[in-house]
């Protein structure tokens, strides 16, 4: 049986995040087990760290597609220490230069593909086919359990990088 339930705590559709977090909270409450919240971009980094041979000074830049030329991205070192906190970035040829001028930067995730043509610095490296997988949560969840880094089941909420803005449909069903 599970000693804790873990859940992604960042980026995704608003409804999907709410449903997933509500389900995890219900399971934790009902089974009286702790809740662990894991940053999606860190989970996305686990297969890169496990299966790719990176230089010691490499920086990691996981990216999630946020539509148009925007991505949700953060920059980490190989120990997943935050070098730049998550932000919604509109990517252009000057994006991430402060990091690219200092070290090799590895871009991956479903937002990285659309950035390949824009980010052409010699220190920019792109890794294809990296997706957030539940099994990649385990190493991070294990560390959280060791630290007893549990979330309050009653008050935990997903991190919404942007505010939800509801809009009216352009066409009415009556038209």
Summary of predicted features, one role per range:
Residues 10-13, 17, 31-32, 60, ...:
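Glycine-rich, flexible loop/turn motifs
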Residues 9-47, 51:
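Glycine/small-residue-rich loop that forms an oxyanion/phosphate-binding "nest" at active or ligand-binding sites
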Residues 30, 47-51, 78, 140-147:
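Active-site catalytic microenvironments for nucleophilic, acid-base chemistry
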Residues 34-132, 160, 165-166:
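Surface "functional belts" at beta-alpha junctions
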Residues 83, 127-175:
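Acyltransferase
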Residues 12, 27, 107, 138, ...:
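A residue-level signal for conserved active-site and pocket-lining positions in enzyme catalytic cores
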Residues 19-23, 92, 133-137:
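Catalytic-loop motifs flanking and including active-site residues across diverse enzymes
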Residues 1-8:
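Short, small-residue-biased leader/transition segments that mark boundaries at the very start
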């Amino acid at each position: 049986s599970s000693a804790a339930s873990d859940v992604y705590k960042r980026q995704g559709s608003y409804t999907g995040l709410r449903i997933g977090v509500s389900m995890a909270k219900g399971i934790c409450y009902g089974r009286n087990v702790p809740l662990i919240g894991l940053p999606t971009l860190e989970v996305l980094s686990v297969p890169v760290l496990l299966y790719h041979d990176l230089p010691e000074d490499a920086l990691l830049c996981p990216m999630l597609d946020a539509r148009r030329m925007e991505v949700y991205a953060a920059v980490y070192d190989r120990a997943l220490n935050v070098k730049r906190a998550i932000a919604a970035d509109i990517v252009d040829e000057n994006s991430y230069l402060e990091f690219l001028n200092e070290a090799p930067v590895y871009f991956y995730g479903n937002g990285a593909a659309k950035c390949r043509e824009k980010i052409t610095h010699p220190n920019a490296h792109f890794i294809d086919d990296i997706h957030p997988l539940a099994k990649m949560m385990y190493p991070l969840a294990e560390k959280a359990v060791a630290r007893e880094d549990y979330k309050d089941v009653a008050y935990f909420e997903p991190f919404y990088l942007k505010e939800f803005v509801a809009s009216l449909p352009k066409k009415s069903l009556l038209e």
